[in-house]
A protein has these predicted regions:
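Conserved active-site-proximal phosphate/metal-binding subdomains
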Residues: 1-29, 217, 236-261, 268-337
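Long, hydrophobic, well-ordered secondary-structure blocks that form the structural core
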Residues: 117, 128-152
């Protein structure tokens, strides 16, 4: 199956999403349930457009050493610095083709077979997190991502993830902006540095804070002892009028990049975008909506096709900019138009 075939198939299988040739957030702008953004629906398109305003510096006066796109992270080696982003409640947002267990297992196993890995989701229904942990166990590796619930529930979910073999865990702290979290008793949502530190210490495995958009926030995550951060605005789904992740990444990387792992998401769609993210200071990227489309359009074959496309594009970028390894990619490789 090719990427184009999976995309075409998804158009008859997926709800609330048009499986567009270019996943730029415009056609689905305010579609929630579905892949849309909050409020005016401008943040997801802004994420995408910000990457398009960064260009690559052609330079082939370099040793012809071949290209290595692999990365070592989470104590594992992966073929690409790319991971599928955590998405839960897929039946609600994307239609009934799969239940949560089926979708998450396909995603986790498909990503591992393709040489990468998935972050898995969470939600009000306990099934969402449990499905991710079950899929992680079957796939051999995934990163469970817990919502910023009240302390006792976070501890319970950390225990559950570790019992199923988690080697790292994340918290999408920006989910504080989701209505169901705001309404919970006891209170859930934003966390202090001290509360985050409790989670980090309790986990005892690398803990990643997802939803950091400022240098100030990155420094707080560092102070809490997080192993890494994910620069993310939740795909535009939690706060309208946010800047694009590409616009804030460099400053954050300058502040904490030598002290913790940095992953970024938001509008990354091609291997060229992956290259740009690494040049700005990220160690790896998360990609969300396109991987959902691939599951609905082609299951594990769709995941393999899209991942192969990303690898071919990233390889080409590296060859044509004189970068033999990911470590060679830096800001001298990009141009801001």
């Amino acid at each position: 199956m090719t990427y184009e075939e999976a995309l075409k198939s998804a158009r008859t299988e997926i709800a609330n999403c048009h499986a567009c040739p270019v996943c730029n957030g415009i056609a689905c702008k305010k579609t929630i349930p579905g892949p849309g953004s909050k409020g005016a629906g401008t943040v997801a398109p802004r994420n995408y457009e910000a990457w398009q305003k960064i260009y690559l510096n052609l330079d082939t006066i370099a040793p012809n050493l071949g290209v290595d796109t692999s990365i070592e992270i989470f104590g594992e080696k992966f073929d690409l610095p790319v991971f599928a982003a955590p998405i839960g409640a897929v039946t609600n947002h994307y239609g009934p083709k799969y239940n949560e267990y089926e979708y998450t297992e396909i995603m986790a196993k498909g990503c591992r077979a393709a040489g990468i890995a998935a972050f898995t989701g969470d939600g009000l229904n306990e099934m969402f997190f449990e499905a991710g942990c079950t899929a992680m166990e079957k796939a051999g590796f995934a990163v469970p991502t817990v919502k910023p619930w009240h302390k006792d529930l976070v501890f319970k979910k950390i225990d559950y993830a570790k019992a199923h073999g988690a080697k790292a865990i994340a918290m999408d702290i920006d989910a504080s902006g989701l209505p169901f979290l705001k309404a919970m008793t006891p209170p859930s949502g934003s966390k202090s540095v001290e509360e985050l530190r409790e989670f980090v210490e309790y986990a005892g495995i690398p803990f990643f804070v997802k939803g950091v958009m400022t240098v100030k926030g990155a420094l707080k995550a560092l102070e809490a002892g997080a192993a890494g951060i994910i620069v993310s605005n939740h795909g535009g789904r939690v706060l309208d009028h946010c800047p694009a992740t590409a616009s804030v990444l460099a400053d954050i990387a300058d502040a904490v990049g030598d002290k913790m792992t940095i992953i970024v998401d938001g509008g990354i769609r091609t291997g060229h975008d992956v290259f740009k993210a690494l040049a700005l200071g990220a160690d790896a990227v998360l990609i969300g909506r396109p991987y959902v489309v691939m599951v609905y359009g082609g299951a594990e074959e769709g995941i393999a096709a899209y991942t192969a496309k990303l690898k071919a594009e990233l390889t080409d970028c590296m060859q044509m900019t004189g970068c033999a390894t990911l470590a060679d990619i830096d800001r001298s490789c990009i141009f801001h138009g």
